[in-house]
């Protein structure tokens, strides 16, 4: 619990005509509460709650919803730095759109400063945090800076079984579909979010993202916004593994399997190299490695969730996180898929031509 980050949040300028109540929940029973925070709690300026067990984000957010009674619920991460007029921006939005489902502010990340943060930026890992700058409405958003209308939320809550990831997408899309409307973007409600762990590797985070996405894929309100897709690198390697016995029975040497595996991996690396050069205008092997590592960590998380749950028939399926229309068209292409297909084809031709 970092009082240097929390105190500015707890002392934001309060808009006229609104009652503001802070609820600070710590999901760590062993936390040492700073004296300044404890003092605010003892004076009744905030409500401080400490979970008896480490219960996860869904339980913690649900507890906050239940402990509060305001018409509007603002979720803020505890490590953000808010703009001084954050609450005024939300208050103005409430006055202008009192029947809104909720509002999504902008969560800015600092400029990338190393290979990990550059990889996260290039891979799109932080794009959804600032989507309010470019879209008027959204079906969901990260809960780092997001407000919900309690009356429209009703009795919907975060699913507590989603302990690894996907809980924000699941609830917010369910709430959006249940009300037949989306959350309004609020580009004036800005907070700054530091790079996770001071810019160190986020492989575990990407794994959790993938795992959570595969878990919620099975839910009807999510699945109808998914479609068949070309296999990613991990899925392609798994399919090759399944085919290996038949390849060997056909008399094809095992070295061919190894060669195909190498081509699959090399195509991924070369594609990321081209992405790095095209987008960031630099060709850095460490950056290419971090892009590949973090992207594939998310794919491994997705695959591992399917494998653990016996849902391998959901391989080669992607969620349309824009949630634009149900049953999106399958096998959609983008330039990087086309580039990867082209590179794979060239590598296959070069390999077998040499043979």
Describe the function of each predicted region.
Residues 164, 169-225:
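Catalytic donor/gating beta->alpha subdomain of glycosyltransferases that bind UDP-sugars
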Residues 237-309, 346-355:
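Membrane-embedded multi-pass helical conduit in multi-pass membrane proteins
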Residues 51-68:
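Glycine-rich, basic loop-to-helix element that forms the pyrophosphate-binding segment
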């Amino acid at each position: 619990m970092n009082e240097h980050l929390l105190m500015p949040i707890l002392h934001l300028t309060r808009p006229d005509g609104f009652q503001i109540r802070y609820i600070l929940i710590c999901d760590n029973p062993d936390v040492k509460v700073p004296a300044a925070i404890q003092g605010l709690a003892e004076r009744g300026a905030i409500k401080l709650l400490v979970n008896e067990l480490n219960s996860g984000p869904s339980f913690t957010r649900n507890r906050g919803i239940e402990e509060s009674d305001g018409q509007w619920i603002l979720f803020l991460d505890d490590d953000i730095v808010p703009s001084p007029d954050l609450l005024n921006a939300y208050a103005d939005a409430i006055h202008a759109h009192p029947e809104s489902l909720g509002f999504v502010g902008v969560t800015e990340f600092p400029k990338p400063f190393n290979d990990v943060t550059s990889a996260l930026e290039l891979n799109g890992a932080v794009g959804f945090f600032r989507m309010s700058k470019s879209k008027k409405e959204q079906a969901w958003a990260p809960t780092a800076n997001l407000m919900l209308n309690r009356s429209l939320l009703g009795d919907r809550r975060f699913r507590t079984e989603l302990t690894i990831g996907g809980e924000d997408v699941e609830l917010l899309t369910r709430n959006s579909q249940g009300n037949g409307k989306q959350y309004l973007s609020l580009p004036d409600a800005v907070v700054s979010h530091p790079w996770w762990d001071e810019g160190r590797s986020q492989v575990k985070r990407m794994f959790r993202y993938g795992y959570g996405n595969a878990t919620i894929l099975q839910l009807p309100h999510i699945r109808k916004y998914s479609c068949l897709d070309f296999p990613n690198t991990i899925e392609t390697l798994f399919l090759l593994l399944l085919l290996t016995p038949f390849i060997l029975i056909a008399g094809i040497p095992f070295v061919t399997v190894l060669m195909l595996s190498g081509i699959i991996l090399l195509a991924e690396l070369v594609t990321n190299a081209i992405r790095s050069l095209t987008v960031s205008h630099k060709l850095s092997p460490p950056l290419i490695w971090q892009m590949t590592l973090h992207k594939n960590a998310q794919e491994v998380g997705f695959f591992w969730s399917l494998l653990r749950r016996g849902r391998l028939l959901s391989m080669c399926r992607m969620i349309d996180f824009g949630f634009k229309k149900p049953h999106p068209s399958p096998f959609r292409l983008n330039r990087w898929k086309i580039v990867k297909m082209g590179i794979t084809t060239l590598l296959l031709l070069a390999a077998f031509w040499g043979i």
